């Protein structure tokens, strides 16, 4: 349905929910690993970041984090579909507006997967369900990322990644015996 080359905006996500009423809503947090079908949406967070990177530049941005939670005791009669998810957004928006133009991410963890904030990679429509495929973010160095000139790249505290040293093969001397003595050159 939608492959996200850039991070999905909250507005895009809610639009997909609205266009697909009553469909099951599943989350894949790793390839082949799914949030249990009886999950709850427990919070919708407007998150504001105000950071200073290692190059001394201030960075500010906002995101929306949706917290997914699984009860310790499975609830086979509980499920969140696209319509119920939209109702939760509506409840939140009655209290305060959700940042519609901010990137949307999902906060999830369980006993075998540490809690992480995961962006949307893709949303698959199977006909009767939407599968939101999440993927982990990579950390990065903003000073290195914004450097465009050789001088800026050299000044970034994280600099370019050094190339791996090339390994060379060393010839082994042939020996008539199957033993190896220190200093003999056989190993």
Where are these regions (language model features)?
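Short, solvent-exposed beta-alpha or beta-beta edge segments that form flexible loop/patches at the rim
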Residues: 34-58
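Helix-rich interaction surfaces within compact, conserved domain-sized segments
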Residues: 88-145
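A generic structural signal for short beta-strands and their flanking turns/coil linkers
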Residues: 23, 35-37, 60-64, 100-102
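Oligomerization/assembly interface segments of phage tail-like spikes and tubes
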Residues: 60-72, 134-136
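Charged, amphipathic alpha-helical segments and their flanking helix caps
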Residues: 2-4, 11-12, 73-99
């Amino acid at each position: 349905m939608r492959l996200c080359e850039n991070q999905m905006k909250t507005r895009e996500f809610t639009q997909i929910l609205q266009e697909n009423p009553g469909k099951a809503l599943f989350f894949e947090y790793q390839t082949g690993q799914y949030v249990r079908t009886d999950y709850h949406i427990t919070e919708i967070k407007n998150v504001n970041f105000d950071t200073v990177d290692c190059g001394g530049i201030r960075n500010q941005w906002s995101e929306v984090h949706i917290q997914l939670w699984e009860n310790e005791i499975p609830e086979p009669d509980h499920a969140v579909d696209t319509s119920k998810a939209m109702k939760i957004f509506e409840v939140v928006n009655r209290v305060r507006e959700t940042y519609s133009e901010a990137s949307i991410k999902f906060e999830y963890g369980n006993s075998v997967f540490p809690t992480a904030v995961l962006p949307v990679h893709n949303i698959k429509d199977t006909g009767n369900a939407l599968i939101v495929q999440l993927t982990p973010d990579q950390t990065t160095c903003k000073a290195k990322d914004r450097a465009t000139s050789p001088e800026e790249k050299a000044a970034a505290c994280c600099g370019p990644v050094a190339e791996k040293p090339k390994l060379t093969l060393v010839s082994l001397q042939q020996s008539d015996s199957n033993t190896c003595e220190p200093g003999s050159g056989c190993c």
